[in-house]
Amino acid sequence: MQPPGIRLCRLEEIPDGDSRGFDPLNTGQNTMLVVRQGGALYAWRDACPHINGVPMAWRKDAYLNAGRDRIVCSAHGAQFDIATGLCTLGPCLGQSLEPVNILVAGDGTIYWQPRPR
């Protein structure tokens, strides 16, 4: 059976209230991030809209603020709503992170589903 996308990890590898970066195309740096909050998963391109291509994490898998309720860009401190990706504070106010399609299979495996070109 064909997998439903590119395997990222298993659901239990991202604890609730935590985040993790991924490099599904083996580019040498994380190109997407996944946040698990309240049982839901939110996936975004790992690039700040203020300066396109700037990675968000300040260290490996560190995408969230101290309160673990916002995604933070390490380059200039912009803060983003986890569920919507909307910038709520910082130089990109009103801009949004780019969403990424993911799927959780019945066995708990998380897959990235690239958009068709």
Task: Please state what every model-predicted region is.
Residues G77, C87-T88:
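A conserved acidic, glycine/proline-rich C-terminal tail/linker
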Residues C92-L93:
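Short Gly/Pro-enriched turn/cap motifs at secondary-structure boundaries
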Residues M1-G67, D81-I82, S96-R117:
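N-terminal pre-ligand scaffold of iron-sulfur
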Residues C48, C73-H76:
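Short cysteine clusters
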